[in-house]
Amino acid sequence: MYSTFALITALSLAPAPGQPATGGITLTNVRNTHGELGGTRPDNKFIPGDVVFVAFDIEGLTVGPKGDVKYTMAMEVTDKNNKTIFKPDAATRTDYMPLGGSKLPGRAFITCGLDLEPGTCTLKLVVTDEASKQSVPLTRTFEVLKKDFGIAAVFASQDETGNIPAATTGVVGSMIYVRYGIVNFARDPATKQPNVMVEIMMFDEEGKPTVKESIVREYKSGVPEDRLGFPDGFALPFTRVGKFTVKIKATDKVANKSYTFELPVAAVPPG
């Protein structure tokens, strides 16, 4: 995952803070999220190597007799100097709303390259209803922090390899995989390898640990010298109802640095 990061890459197209449409389209409930289907992320600050996930609802699209909607998204990303760093071709797609209603969930994914300079980046998008030709422009900013050791691109998946996204709220009896990357670590001068310790601990809604001891992993080998990051993850079974916090702490023993990421998760009863 971290061997091919470009300056910045858009993985999908989608909008940001809701602004009024020129016609009947609006974008509502816009927020940064922990992964594609995760809960709301409270901040807009990201380290190089991280992924900006944006979720929203599109309201007012023309719905066909079979529940189909057709729309186009255009996107541009600029850096702190207002220089365009990514501008893909506009994408037109058809989605379906078989359960009815007037809202279509949408998402955006933007990867902050490991070489991206710190500063405020701006994401500009335009969503157009192909049936009515009504459009809505949107602008969203996010801050790229200076390059440093950390945990990046935290998300949940249904599979161990991270190919099928999952929500961070699950039904008791189900299981998700929490995926993330360790980035920008130092290397031991003798071995040319990182020396990173990862600690994983779960806490309940009252802030109490759910088990007595944390999961501890150490990474000292197997990372090619041209890599600035490596993936990691673990399985998380939902065994009881409640709200919980997954605390992941990574320590770079070579650089004597540590980084902590907290991911809220929840389990609900089946049925």
What would you call each of these model-derived segments?
Residues G18-G271:
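Intrinsically disordered, low-complexity terminal regions enriched in Ser/Thr/Pro/Gly
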Residues Y2-L13:
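Sec-dependent N-terminal signal peptides
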